[in-house]
């Protein structure tokens, strides 16, 4: 069985260094049994980056009404009235993005960004800088935690997670100067300072398919397509952490590659 020490050693072997800023996407099942469970994986990650390092994860929200309000869809009024507002202190994380985010959020020094559907969680010296502000309409593009993550020299870590989970490539989609990007609207229940719930409308890029060709069921989206092309260049690190095949990417490099890829393949003639 793996331990905090063995996972930390594996992370260092992969290229994680003290002081690093890491955005982690993890499959705990792929990592395999670890003494102490998921909390020990978080401890190993924190040990690997040290007290000067910062970890970030894509928490989202387990009660996000994104699909229920997408592009003008109307919820049943009773359901809408009873839907809980997003609360930084108590709202759960979306399990589809990995259970590790819940354990990151439980850290005493964790900070969480205020965009309900695109909420990020961070721990470490840069946590507040990364997570604040995070407004509706700036989910994963300019003005988002992802932009600040890239700007601060972050690295993307996949622990047994698939290549379609490289969330920072949504930032590349947002900033790439290409035509015909898909946009969506949705609503989120926000808790005001007066304790009242207000449903607020957001408009943003479509993270489920930035172009029509990437929004086809059963076909790879832009994130997976770009990540696979990037891996072929060999500018990343690969290794095994626990039992998990793992990747380490320089965020700025893969984002720059992603922007160039989109321009070359889908830019205006």
From Swiss-Prot:
Enzyme class name: transferase
Top-level division of the source organism's lineage: Bacteria
Reaction equations catalysed: a 2-deoxystreptamine antibiotic + acetyl-CoA = an N(3)-acetyl-2-deoxystreptamine antibiotic + CoA + H(+)
Enzyme Commission number(s) of this protein: 2.3.1.81
GO molecular function: aminoglycoside 3-N-acetyltransferase activity
Alphabetical UniProt keywords: Acyltransferase, Antibiotic resistance, Transferase
Gene Ontology BP terms: response to antibiotic
Keyword Magnesium: no
Database matches in PANTHER family: AMINOGLYCOSIDE N3-ACETYLTRANSFERASE, SPBETA PROPHAGE-DERIVED AMINOGLYCOSIDE N(3')-ACETYLTRANSFERASE-LIKE PROTEIN YOKD
Protein family membership: Belongs to the antibiotic N-acetyltransferase family.
Function: Resistance to antibiotics containing the 2-deoxy-streptamine ring including gentamicin, kanamycin, tobramycin, neomycin and apramycin.
Protein name per UniProt: Aminoglycoside N(3)-acetyltransferase III
Organism: Serratia marcescens
Recorded name of the encoding gene: aac3-Vb
């Amino acid at each position: 069985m793996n331990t905090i020490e063995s996972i930390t050693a594996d992370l260092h072997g992969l290229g994680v260094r003290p002081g690093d800023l890491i955005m982690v996407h993890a499959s705990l099942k792929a990592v395999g049994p670890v003494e102490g469970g998921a909390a020990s994986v978080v401890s190993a990650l924190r040990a690997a980056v040290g007290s000067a390092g910062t970890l970030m994860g894509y928490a989202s929200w387990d009660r996000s009404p994104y699909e229920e309000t997408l592009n003008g869809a109307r919820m049943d009024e009773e359901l809408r009235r009873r839907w809980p507002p997003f609360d930084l202190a108590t709202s759960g994380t979306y399990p589809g993005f990995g259970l590790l985010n819940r354990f990151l959020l439980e850290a005493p020094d964790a900070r969480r960004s205020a965009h309900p559907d695109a909420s990020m969680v961070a721990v470490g010296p840069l946590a507040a800088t990364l997570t604040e502000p995070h407004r509706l309409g700036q989910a994963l593009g300019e003005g988002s935690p992802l932009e600040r993550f890239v700007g601060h020299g972050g690295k993307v870590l996949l622990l047994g997670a698939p290549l379609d989970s490289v969330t920072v490539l949504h930032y590349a989609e947002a900033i790439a100067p290409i035509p015909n990007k898909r946009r969506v609207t949705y609503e989120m229940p926000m808790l005001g300072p007066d304790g009242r719930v207000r449903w607020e409308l957001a408009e943003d890029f479509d993270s489920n398919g930035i172009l029509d060709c990437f929004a086809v069921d059963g076909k790879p989206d832009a994130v997976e397509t770009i990540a696979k092309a990037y891996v072929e260049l060999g500018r990343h690190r690969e290794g095994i952490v626990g039992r998990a095949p793992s990747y380490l990417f320089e965020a700025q490099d893969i984002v720059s590659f992603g922007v160039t890829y989109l321009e070359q393949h889908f830019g205006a003639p």
